[in-house]
Regions:
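Conserved HGGG/HGGXW glycine-rich cap/lid loop of the alpha/beta-hydrolase fold
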Residues: 35-84
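Alpha/beta-hydrolase fold catalytic core
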Residues: 1-46, 67-70, 109-113, 300-306
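Active-site loop/oxyanion-hole signature of alpha/beta-hydrolase fold enzymes
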Residues: 13-14, 25-27, 32-38, 73-120, ...
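Flexible "cap/lid" loop of the alpha/beta hydrolase fold
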Residues: 134, 142-178
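Conserved alpha/beta-hydrolase catalytic His-Asp/Glu region
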Residues: 175-232
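Gly/Ala-rich beta-loop-alpha elbow adjacent to hydrolase catalytic centers
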Residues: 121, 125, 129
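Conserved loop-alpha-helix segment in the C-terminal half of the alpha/beta-hydrolase fold
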Residues: 246-283
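Catalytic histidine-centered segment of alpha/beta-hydrolase-like enzymes
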Residues: 283-292
Length: 306
């Protein structure tokens, strides 16, 4: 891991943590690392992975609580925050995120071969962490999924229409980048997204996803993140991956989250052999927005009760 403070980025680095870089073979992941006095040989670190179009600041409130017990590293996934973008011609497939996480752990957290680490993922990050835990159970001590319980699925008959849609979008490309007068204007737009945020939460999350351009600001996030993926998992594949998770797992279910009324959720939950479910108040960003204490209490109790 390479510790740095990026020029001009100090406004979005919370007290008690530092900017970090983790070089991979084809790009460099950035993120935030929270200081702890706990020896990694006593308590393995916690890796935190955010949701789609978010960044490491998603864990600004939760990470300091966990750092009282272990080293905490929140990554910006590829194409998000301060991390590198995929090369031209490439997209952002789900399994590529899992490959990034695998490479990150292998190269920068080799101690996990002896002391399995903890994974905490929100939304897409929870999906990525769950797939990694299914593939490499020996490297994961405990898994936490916040408002996340397996990948979005499509029926097999939707394979070709999905492929067509993805290839057409790849050929047509992205729309020109919107330019905002200030970060606050972009944050206002983000408040009304698919998963709405309060002004406070949007103000915490958005600056790390922005960069200056001329007299204004544009999204730093890769526009290709909004392109449809060419291939999605079937429900049978999702269920098989969840059934392969051997590590103790916590599902944090938000009362007003995206999964609150999701059909088929009980079936997925039943497939994970060692699953604990906790219900918390709040929306999809229950770990960042509003009263986050119930989420922090549940996760601390789950991760550090041994």
């Amino acid at each position: 891991m390479i510790d740095t403070v990026l020029p001009g980025s100090g406004h979005d680095i919370p007290a008690g943590c530092r900017e970090a870089h983790w070089p991979l073979e084809n790009l460099t992941l950035a993120g935030l690392s929270w200081h702890t006095s706990v020896d990694n040989e006593v308590r393995p670190p916690v890796l935190m992975v955010h949701g789609w179009l978010d960044n490491a600041m998603s864990f600004k409130k939760l990470a300091p609580e966990l750092a009282k017990y272990a080293g905490v590293h929140a990554i910006d996934m590829a194409g998000h925050g301060h991390s590198g973008h995929r090369p031209p011609g490439y997209g952002y497939w789900l399994m590529d995120y899992v490959a990034d996480l695998s490479e990150l752990i292998d190269h920068h957290f080799p101690e996990s071969e002896r002391f399995p680490l903890d994974l905490v993922g929100h939304s897409l990050g929870g999906i990525v962490c769950a797939l990694y835990a299914a593939a490499f159970p020996e490297r994961v001590h405990r898994l936490v999924m916040i408002d996340s319980l397996g990948a979005l699925s499509r029926s097999a008959k939707e394979t070709v229409p999905q492929l067509r849609k993805a290839l057409q979008k790849k050929r047509n490309g992205s729309a020109p980048a919107a330019v905002y007068s200030g970060v606050e204007a972009a944050a206002k737009i983000r408040e009304g997204g698919l998963s709405p945020l309060s002004p406070e939460a949007a103000g915490l999350l958005v600056p790390r996803n922005m960069r200056s351009m001329g007299d204004g600001f544009v999204w730093r996030t890769d526009a290709r993140l909004r392109h449809p993926t060419a291939l999605m998992m079937t429900e049978e594949q999702v269920q098989a991956s969840l059934a392969s998770i051997q590590t103790p797992t916590l599902f944090v279910r938000a009362a007003q989250g995206l999964l609150a009324n999701h059909n088929g959720l009980d079936k997925r939950a039943e497939l994970i052999p060692n699953l604990t479910t906790v219900d918390v108040p709040g929306g999809h960003h229950c770990h960042l927005d509003g009263d986050t204490a119930p989420v922090a209490t549940a996760i601390k109790g789950f991760l550090f009760n041994d």
